[in-house]
Amino acid sequence: DIAVVCGKPEFLPDAHLDTLTNPILIVEVLSPSTADYDKGAKFEHYRTIESLQEYILVWQDKKRAARYTKQIDGSWLLSDFIGEESEIKLSSIECTLTMDDIYDKVEFEEEAQN
């Protein structure tokens, strides 16, 4: 998983030094055991982080990603990206990622068996 901060990282007081309070972008890799939590309760918590602008979910077993982008009114817009040709524009950090960028050196089970 990845968190991006612009400026100086801020952490929860009296907590472990890995609890950021000011990320602008969070990327989560979904696993079968955590996918429901990452898409549900965890994202609900992340939506309370004022600085957060984008939340990206990346599937580990196929070339698929979902991007939630915070809108001006505070709502979140979902965009799905499926397949080799998809590109994800990350407006929070002015960057575009292709599926090949995201899945570089990843071998999926069906590819490994062929």
Question: What spans do the regions from the language model cover?
Answer:
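C-terminal interaction segment
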Residues: 1-49, 54-114
